Amino acid sequence: MHRITYTSSRAAQAISLDGDGVYVGTGGGLRSHEWTYSLTRRAVKGLSLGARTVEVSAYAEDAKANALRRMADADAAAQSPGLLTVDGEWNMRCYIVEMSASKTYMEGVQLSLKIALIDECWWRVRLESFVTGYNDGGLDFPFDFPFDFNFKSGSGTVYNTSDMPAPAIITFYGPCTNPYVTIGGNRYEVDVQVATGHRVVIDFTGAAPTVMHYDQYGNGYSVFSEAVRDGGLGGGSYAFQPVPAGSSAVTWSGTFSWSVELHEQDTEPLWAR
């Protein structure tokens, strides 16, 4: 395991846990997972993943130990989880709920950290973007995007490289009316009018899904009730349906631009040497 950081969502500050005054070694406790289940006479039922606690040993210089403790405690007090990131891509929301010293040295301390891992799985972001296949003078959005658009129209493919369905953030860019896309046979639709420069964002990566309408200045309001949810999960027209593993065919009208941000799932960060 390499390059581990703890980032405070409250203060937007990060502390390296990989040698910059704090060292967790291989972080063995982070490389574990456990399914909850119940046993019946001839079956296993209710298999699921959920929040859990792990223990990690760390050596820290005095100043870094103090900084990590203060940051983690402030996050916990604010009920604002921090973010663990491994190798710059695998993420897990967490709280450091206990920190104890087993040994002290001249300039540092040996720590035991108890970490509450909140997300069901570790996740990494994979972004796919699609635009209309025609334009007269190029795309000129009133705000910048953190990615480049690929020119595709009407159909395409989305790749979820993990082995499990992925939660996602789907964004429709105006102008469009009642925009929808079909990914892997499921239709994602919001019945709203989206003006030029505005966007509608379906987000089902958190504990509760949201659907927001933003104007060109970033001001937003909820349009959750306008998201189509016919048949519920697996019903074929459910706005919060996780994107299947592997390759999924995509279709849409081709008259508006949109993007899908996959949060690919894995039970543990990948081993790297």
What are these regions (language model features)?
Residues M1, D75-P81, Y173-T177, G206-A207:
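A short, compositionally biased
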Residues M1-A51, E89-A101:
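Solvent-exposed edge beta-strands and adjacent loop segments
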Residues Y23-V24, L83-L127:
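Short beta-strand and beta-hairpin "edge-sheet" elements
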Residues H33-K64, E107-C121, S248:
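Oligomerization/assembly interface segments of phage tail-like spikes and tubes
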Residues S48-G50, A76, Y105-V109, N160-M164, ...:
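Solvent-exposed loop and beta-edge segments used for protein-protein assembly and interaction
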Residues Y59-S100, A249:
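Short, acidic/charged, Gly/Pro-enriched secondary-structure junctions
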Residues R69-A76, R124-V125, S129-D136:
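Charged, amphipathic alpha-helical segments and their flanking helix caps
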Residues F130-R273:
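Intrinsically disordered, low-complexity segments enriched in serine, threonine, and glycine
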